[in-house]
Amino acid sequence: MNPLSQSALVPLRKKAKMAPISQSFCQHNVKFKEIVLFLVERKMGSSRRTFLMELARKRGFQTEIELSDSVTHIVAENNSGAEVLEWLQSKKLGFTVKTHILDISWFTECMEAGRPVEIQNRHLLPVQQDCSANFNPPLSSSCVQVSQYACQRCTTLQDTNRIFTDAFDILAEHFEFCENKGRTVAFLRASSLIKSLPFPITAMKELEGLPWLGDQMKGIIEEILEEGKSYKVLEVMNEERYKSFKQFTSVFGVGLKTSDKWFRMGFRTLEEIKNEKELKLTKMQKCGLLYYEDITSYVSRAEAETTEQLIKSIVWKFVPDAIVTLTGGFRRGKKKGHDVDILITCARKGKEKNILHNTMSVLKNRGLLLFYNIIESTFDETKLPSRHVDALDHFQKCFTILKLPKRQMDIGNIIDPHECERKNWKAVRLDLVITPYEQYPYALLGWTGSRQFERDLRRYATHEKRMMLDNHGLYDKTKNNFLKANNEEDIFKQLGLDYLEPWERNA
């Protein structure tokens, strides 16, 4: 038996080197950096697995020979979710909450399309059902442990439970309109948690042990599972106050206080607001109504990147080494958004101070500004970071409505304001934020978002690390000093957190 056993081990040693695959990997360009594949060998076989991994690399995908924390998608063939978990356990391998466990059909469709395809429910291998007791799951009936903090969860744009998160987002918005902060935060937390789950919710038992899901949230989920909809959500969407506030707050320059004032005055629609000549509006609100159709339509990634290039071309004329960064949802990988946020700094101390006013002058002279409001810096370096998780920062900034030419080639050519009179442009909301270089990593982290991610990051710093974090810096209360950071990775490290890429922060 010994000679047979030894001979059987020989080819396994040769395969372990995997030199040809490693070399091949280096030869292929990676097109989809946000995706790392791991193919389960069980029922697939070594030869087929090697072939499929090489095929994926040729298509621009990253693959891992061994399962690691970098893996985002586990692909299995002819296996159930429970079987995959059992195989991982037998190999003493694990996976994180950010990992999708998928059937080979998803992989096949990706190879045919030459790009990652959207994950559908039919692609998912449920990991919640029939979980073996041998796995010793950390939660009562859940095979996935989920942190109460969004900054400890990977949340991509692939929301497999959108029917539930959309419902919670509507209810959160409803309570925000009612100025009920407690219930607003509760539904935002619940929505954020569900967005991070790597499996579709199909039964109530899958929710056991998960944080932030109270009886009311569970009741809504159960109703949707049984009825396909939530009557509470439908009731809210039909409420007169909700519908009016939804319209009012969509106007640039209109917040909750103004919406409440208009509602108490008897206004219910934007048409009524527009037709009331005696109503006093701020300049910002007038512009918001004047360019309402453009502003409320989505900004595409192409439009956001065109705006970024426009700002870069202007800023670099004054400060060639300035750092100009597109932030917000677009930095998190979104294909569309409501506005464009751009962060500007310079490594040479003090060089950033005149950038904003100079940039506004150029835009104004080119006839590309429909509205702008500059807010000067109110930062006080003697003060500690704010204790409030929703606190605004104190950077110099400008809120604008930009007249963006629809053809990118027009950007550098427009000098005469009259050239913009024809409607060959689109009104786009643009926020420019100027930050000192030493505060740039914190500003970049804060302006990248998402809102719930940043809220939980600050809460985590306060409650778990006795630190104070905002867009200006990180203060360690145990050492009574500010901590320096050269980049976002340093901030995560100082907080003792695993680094999450921007596209993993869509909480």
Swiss-Prot record:
Entry coiled-coil feature ranges: none
Q: Which segment of the chain is annotated as a signal peptide?
A: none
Question: Where do the annotations place a 2'-deoxyribonucleoside 5'-triphosphate binding?
Answer: G329, F330, R331, R332, G333, K334, H338, D339, V340, D341, G446, W447
Which organs or tissues contain this protein? Found in the thymus and not in the spleen, kidney, intestine, or liver.
| Names of the cofactor(s) | Mg(2+)
Q: What is this enzyme's catalytic activity, as reactions?
A: DNA(n) + a 2'-deoxyribonucleoside 5'-triphosphate = DNA(n+1) + diphosphate
Gene3D superfamilies associated with the record:
5' to 3' exonuclease, C-terminal subdomain, Beta Polymerase, domain 2, BRCT domain, DNA polymerase beta, N-terminal domain-like, DNA polymerase, thumb domain
Fetch the InterPro entries from UniProt: BRCT_dom (IPR001357), BRCT_dom_sf (IPR036420), DNA-dir_DNA_pol_X (IPR002054), DNA_pol-X_BS (IPR019843), DNA_pol_b-like_N (IPR010996), DNA_pol_B_palm_palm (IPR028207), DNA_pol_lambd_fingers_domain (IPR018944), DNA_pol_lamdba_lyase_dom_sf (IPR027421)
How, per the record, is the cofactor bound?
Can also utilize other divalent cations, such as Mn(2+) and Co(2+) (in vitro).
Q: Name one Pfam family in it.
A: BRCT
Q: Where in the cell is it found?
A: Nucleus
- Name of the top EC class for this enzyme: transferase
Which residue ranges does the record annotate as region Involved in DNA binding?
254-258
Lineage top rank: taxon: Eukaryota
The chain positions of domain BRCT read: 27-124
Q: Name one GO biological process term.
A: DNA modification
- Keyword Iron present in the record's keywords: the answer is no
Q: What is its EC number?
A: 2.7.7.31
Cross-referenced PANTHER family: DNA NUCLEOTIDYLEXOTRANSFERASE, DNA POLYMERASE TYPE-X FAMILY MEMBER
Protein name according to UniProt:
DNA nucleotidylexotransferase
